[in-house]
């Protein structure tokens, strides 16, 4: 297992200070290990997640090579791959790409038109509200990251304007249970990629507006409006220091309300079918999202006192190191449930809705890994039949000297080798 930094590197070094998991602690389940602490309904901090993963790595004896960024993966003749690191190369029959979906913050083109007086941050750069200059803050994006940061920054005493596009409204609790409990037991989180009508669209769905807090506080748009956050539409562009927002805010909010209602209907139907309806509080529906009668469409950033912008506009994977033609025009690997069919022996894991709706969660790794190992083993069996041996081995010829910057946070990500 090749890791660019430390085990659980992103959780240790690339998260803001107050971040907690969106999923309850009981949902932290890995093959052979699950959360066994005294707060199963709580939410781990980033540091606690790092410890959880590191402990697991030690317990299973994972052969991790830390401080080993992968700088290239290329085909090796007719079979297998060559994986390059600053210090050496590996020849392998199969390769599992586990670098994740959140390597590179997505910053819209509008950033190039921001006035020089406005400081810009991505979630990977933001640590806490003290990092920000005095003045108003524009947060762009209203998925889980955007609404959490908008809440934190507003409560720090700064006026926040939140630019809202497509989003998934969530509520932490429903009928006396965590929403994730309902989605887990009802099978929503275990829906397979080959059971949905449009998997491409399903993989692009933003993360739900939830936060993991001790007080189970809500972070949907109504909760943010209640503490003074100004809600505007999607940021369309910036012209002459003026931010222009889409007029689709009401439509986006009505759609998010509709989808939340559908999810709650699914939960209610499951509770009735499985005899749980009478043992939990009765069904109810939440107030519709409150949208200003005349949402702001233009904001002069300088005159409006905007001192900083936080680009909570999503992340993209980084495959700049992958020299195999399997990446599409949008920078995503073409695959069938994690099996890269155009590159035999190459597999993908840890991506949104890879094989199931929970594929990008810690809890989703177990089932996906089991499925992919079956496919991988069948591939290796075929190679062994033809060649008589399989495996991965170091190749030390013509390898460059180790780089001194191999632990930089912007180095290429880890790759798992089998």
What is each of the regions a protein language model found here?
Residues 22, 408, 415-418:
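Compositionally biased amphipathic helical and low-complexity segments enriched in hydrophobic
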Residues 402:
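Cationic, low-complexity basic patches in intrinsically disordered or flexible, solvent-exposed regions
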Residues 1-5, 9-13, 43-391, 414-418:
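Flavin (primarily FAD) cofactor-binding/catalytic cores of flavoenzymes
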Residues 6-34, 224:
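Redox-cofactor-proximal catalytic regions of oxidoreductases
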């Amino acid at each position: 297992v090749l890791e660019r930094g430390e085990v659980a590197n992103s959780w240790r070094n690339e998260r803001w200070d107050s971040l907690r998991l969106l999923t309850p602690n009981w949902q932290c389940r890995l093959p052979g290990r699950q959360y066994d602490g005294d707060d199963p309904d709580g939410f781990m901090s980033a540091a606690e997640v790092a410890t959880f993963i590191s402990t697991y790595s030690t317990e299973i004896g994972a052969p991790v090579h830390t401080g080993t960024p992968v700088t290239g993966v290329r085909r090796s003749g007719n079979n297998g791959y060559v994986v390059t690191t600053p210090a050496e190369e590996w020849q392998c029959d199969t390769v599992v790409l586990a670098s994740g979906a959140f390597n590179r913050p997505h910053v819209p083109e509008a950033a190039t038109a921001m006035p020089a007086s406005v400081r810009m941050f991505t979630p990977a750069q933001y640590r806490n509200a003290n990092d920000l200059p005095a003045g108003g803050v524009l947060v762009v994006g209203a998925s889980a990251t955007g609404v959490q940061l908008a809440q934190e920054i507003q409560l720090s005493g700064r006026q926040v304007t939140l630019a809202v596009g497509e989003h998934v409204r969530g509520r932490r609790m429903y009928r006396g249970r965590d929403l994730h409990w309902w989605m887990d037991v009802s099978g929503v989180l275990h829906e397979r990629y080959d059971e949905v009508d449009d998997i491409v669209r399903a993989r692009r769905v933003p993360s739900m507006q939830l936060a993991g807090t001790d007080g189970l506080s809500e972070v949907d748009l109504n909760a943010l409006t209640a503490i003074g956050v100004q809600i505007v539409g999607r940021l369309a562009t910036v012209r002459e220091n003026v931010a222009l927002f889409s007029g689709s805010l009401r439509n986006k909010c009505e759609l998010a309300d509709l989808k939340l209602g559908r999810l709650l209907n699914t939960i209610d139907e499951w509770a009735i079918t499985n005899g749980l309806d009478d043992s939990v509080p009765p069904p109810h529906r939440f107030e519709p999202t409150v949208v200003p009668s005349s949402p702001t469409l233009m904001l002069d950033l300088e005159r409006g006192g905007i001192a900083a912008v936080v680009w909570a506009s999503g992340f993209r994977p980084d495959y700049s190191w992958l020299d195999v033609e399997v990446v599409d025009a949008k920078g995503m690997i073409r695959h069938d449930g994690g099996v890269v069919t155009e590159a035999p022996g190459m597999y993908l894991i840890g991506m949104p809705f890879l094989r199931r709706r929970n594929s990008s969660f810690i809890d989703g790794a177990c089932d996906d890994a089991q499925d992919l190992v079956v496919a991988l083993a069948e591939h290796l069996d075929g190679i062994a039949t033809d060649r008589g041996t399989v495996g991965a081995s170091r190749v030390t010829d013509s390898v460059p000297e180790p780089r001194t910057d191999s632990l930089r946070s912007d180095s290429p990500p880890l790759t798992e080798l089998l």
